[in-house]
Amino acid sequence: IQSILYDIYDDATETNDSVSLGLAPIYNVLTGAQKNTPALTSIFSFAAAIKAENPAADTDINTLLTAQSIVGSGMDIYGSTETNNAGNANVLPIYTDITANGIASSEVCSIKTFSTKNKLSVYRFFKFTANTTATYTFSASSTGTTSPAIDPDIKVFKDGVLVDKFETTGPSQTGDVDLSPGDYVIAIADFNNITEETNNEIGCFTLSITQI
């Protein structure tokens, strides 16, 4: 990520680097589209914005991204076109689409293969749109048995701001949130993967959202 940002900024022309936008376009994205994105901050939300605001540099920025094994062509803020799963089936999609119809999502798994806390796929992300002002129930249920026991925690975000979180101990997690219309991101992790240092633990669960 550091090299992509620097190569977008600098004047040097190197292998895979023909971009020289300077600081202003980067600053504009960081204080504008990136600051207000409904997605969580990532290379995808940043690159999608800087490409959109500097269309003449789109191809050259894609080349930079490709050199780092990131799919640039067609990129959106959610990384929907990404195909690099770092060799692990529990990485993609980065965001799973879900609707507030009470139907459980497909199974997703929180892993600590790449270490704990905020490392790759410790948190799994969902995105959904609230179409009306209402109370919504979020329910995460574990789908397997591991030691230590799976303990899903839920965080709800709007435009990068934490709206609410549910972190009681147990194999399932449920909470109600009053939401206004808009796009939301839900981050779910197995608590064991946030806090413990042993690798290769996996906690799998489904999520459902119900409008009350």
Predicted regions and their residues:
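Active-site-proximal alpha-helical
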Residues: 1-56
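Intrinsically disordered, low-complexity coil segments
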Residues: 15, 144-147
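Non-catalytic extracellular/lumenal accessory regions of secreted precursors
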Residues: 53-135, 141-145, 168-169, 210-212
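C-terminal edge strands of extracellular/lumenal beta-sandwich accessory domains
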Residues: 124-127, 146, 153-163, 177-212
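Extracellular attachment fibers and their assembly/anchoring modules
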Residues: 138-140, 151-153
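Short, surface-exposed coil-to-beta transition loops
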Residues: 149-151, 172-173
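Solvent-exposed serine/threonine-rich low-complexity stretches and specific carbohydrate-binding patches
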Residues: 163-171
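Beta-sandwich interaction modules
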Residues: 170-178
